[in-house]
């Protein structure tokens, strides 16, 4: 492949794209002044994400820990409430956790081993014209024939060549690293205000604990940290910690309408991972989709029309699933549904299996509702149908839930298409 590629950002998307392209003979330059670094997320890497990078990243390459179970706490409002936790056991290798700094460093090492070069400088501007790309750092300009923006939610490449994310398209993850303690269990505490959940994710030598809220939901980072501290105290998730280190980070959180009109690429450039908005709106997990988008551009640059080919591939491997998650998001965190879910986890082994697969990345949103309904006992199924109808009436008056013999059917007059927009639009 005779191609000069400039990649802004050395996270999973950028490093994996660099590895794949350099391996094919492209001349690849990665620009990032500070990678590898920790990322304020859970740190979990699903089995399907590990499978994507298995050829370049052997299992022995990372200091990692395997999650054995997930504990789900009862619904809380702005204050903690009492209730019974439900525990879901996970298969071995269903979910592993690693330091994001170590994971990113391993991918970057693989890219450099394949022939990519790293320029440890901050990119201050990019220019695209009909003949070439210019990437500007404080020390001068670098030129290429194709530009990849893999520089996160605050992507400079996105701001210059597409549209910056609006506030309502972002969420804020805020919390603490709890040093000096770890475990082999995820802990999730559902909350109704803001709608979502608190989490405690173990890493090899500490816990990542936090909460996520839409950026336009009216909560400051300080308020979210206070709620996290209250939960840490109430749930006892960080007993024995030696130090709490605060963090805060923006994460894309798009609606179904946003995904239908997503900015992915244009002539001689594309966006990957968080920079493209390829993050699950429910779990805020983006590593798998970042890696798959990197694979998409590596394959598309061999095509006659790389932009169209890339856009098609991303819609096939990511957008359809993410748009479904976006359509489910508000209903998923409704108090009535959360209470039903916790009851089902307590009473149904089938539902616990579904949740384990969802955590591990094996369960798609496309079949989630029907698999849940099929696994429920008769009494829970009746409650589920009633709950879904109530949520539909209260939150989605334009949608109808109807029953036909043997199944439930959801219809909608405002369902967004899963087909890609015009390339370069």
Q: Where would I find each of the regions flagged by the language model?
A:
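A conserved beta-strand/loop capping segment in the N-terminal third of enzymes
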Residues: 47-106
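FAD/FMN-dependent oxidoreductases across multiple families
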Residues: 125, 217-300, 306-309
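Conserved hydrophobic helix-helix packing surfaces used for dimerization/oligomerization
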Residues: 5-7, 28, 269
């Amino acid at each position: 492949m005779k191609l000069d590629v400039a990649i802004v950002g050395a996270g999973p998307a950028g490093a994996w794209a660099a590895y794949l392209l350099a391996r094919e003979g492209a001349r690849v330059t990665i620009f990032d002044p500070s990678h590898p670094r920790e990322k304020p997320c859970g740190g979990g890497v699903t089995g399907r994400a590990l499978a994507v990078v298995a050829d370049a990243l052997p299992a022995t390459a990372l200091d990692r820990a395997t999650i054995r179970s997930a504990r789900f706490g009862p619904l809380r409002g702005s204050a903690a409430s009492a209730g019974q936790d439900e525990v879901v056991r996970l298969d071995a290798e269903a979910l592993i956790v690693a330091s994001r700094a170590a994971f990113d460093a391993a991918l970057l090492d693989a890219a450099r081993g394949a022939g990519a070069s790293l320029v440890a400088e901050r990119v201050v501007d990019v220019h695209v014209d009909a003949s070439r790309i210019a990437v500007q750092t404080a020390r001068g300009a670098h030129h290429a024939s194709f530009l990849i923006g893999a520089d996160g939610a605050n992507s400079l490449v996105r701001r210059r060549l597409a549209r910056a994310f609006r506030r309502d398209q972002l969420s804020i993850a805020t919390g603490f690293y709890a040093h000096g303690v770890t475990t082999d269990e995820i802990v999730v505490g559902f909350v109704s205000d803001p709608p979502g959940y608190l989490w405690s994710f173990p890493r090899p030598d500490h816990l990542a604990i936090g909460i996520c809220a839409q950026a336009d939901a009216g909560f400051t980072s300080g308020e979210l940290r206070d709620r996290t501290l209250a939960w840490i105290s109430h749930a006892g998730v960080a007993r024995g910690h030696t130090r709490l280190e605060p963090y805060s980070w923006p994460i894309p959180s798009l609606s179904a309408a946003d995904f239908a009109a997503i900015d992915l690429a244009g002539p001689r450039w594309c966006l990957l991972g968080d920079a493209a908005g390829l993050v699950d709106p429910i779990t805020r997990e983006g590593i798998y989709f970042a890696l798959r988008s990197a694979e998409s551009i590596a394959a598309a640059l061999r095509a006659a029309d790389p932009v169209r080919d890339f856009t098609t591939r991303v819609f096939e491997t990511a957008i359809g699933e993410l748009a479904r998650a976006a359509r489910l998001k508000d209903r998923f965190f409704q108090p009535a549904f959360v209470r039903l879910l916790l009851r089902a986890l307590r009473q149904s082994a089938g539902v616990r299996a579904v949740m384990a697969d969802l955590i591990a990345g094996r369960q798609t949103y496309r079949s989630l509702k029907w698999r849940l309904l099929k696994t429920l006992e008769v009494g829970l199924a009746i409650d589920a149908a009633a709950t879904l109808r109530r949520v539909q009436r209260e939150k989605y008056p334009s949608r109808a839930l109807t029953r036909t013999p043997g199944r439930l059917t959801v219809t909608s007059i405002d369902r967004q298409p899963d087909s890609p927009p015009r390339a370069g639009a």
